[in-house]
Amino acid sequence: EIKNVTYFTEIGLTLIVIALFFKVSAAPFHIWTPDVYEGSPTISVLFFATLPKFASLIFLFRFFIEMDISSYSSLLFIFKFVCVLSLLIGAYGAMTQTVIKRLLAFSSINHIGFILLSILSFQFLSQGIFFFYLIIYLVTSFGVFSILLTLRNNLGEIKLITDLTGLKTHNKSKAIALLVLFFSLAGIPPFAGFFAKFFILTASMNEGLIYLSLIAVLSSVIAAFYYLRIIKTMFFNEGEDTLQENSMFYHNVTYILSALFVTFFAFYPDPIIFIINNYFS
């Protein structure tokens, strides 16, 4: 009878975890994400790519720890499997995209893989580091989508990566801000995203998740390619500048603060780590 209770408990926990994976767009439960990102207005994407995901990931983190998911071998395997798929599908899926919001959708799936890796490394990872990665990712995403909200072309919202051609000359401050934000998303030092990934990889290596750590490093290398492709389009591609401004004051404030935040961390990391460790640990 005890075995039956444990069996049904494990089934119930598995269904809850799968529902959460679907909610946060973890692979292979991500199929809806690229189409929704592409088809929705940018302001809507900005919302559901940040705030609901933040709440769902916190719940998933607490659920993993409080329910002691690591003691269930099948559930632990599912977590690792989904982590690997998210890292690889997110990285490889973004490489072939020409629509910028679809690319960002696959990018978000890749970052979910890193967040799942942080959850799997919880024994060697303080809650502060989990929240640090989550906050860095969400702030950076908020900044990127805020810039996209302010840019249009003759047909309306910009859709293709090539629509960003000439941004360097059209609005240098937005081009530089996107450069900083994409460098952070790619995990390129000295920006905040690099330290966030470094802390998680260190914890996962200490946990003994060597193969997951190597896959995460590989996915970061691949991710750097498609972020750099966008940067190349903004700064080096030649073509007609069809960009138009649709700036609101709060959009400009948001992207400037986001870029300053990930840059500030490169030079003064201690205050931010102290705050996160004290308020989220």
Roles of regions detected by a PLM:
Residues 1-281:
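Alpha-helical transmembrane segments of multi-pass membrane proteins predominantly involved
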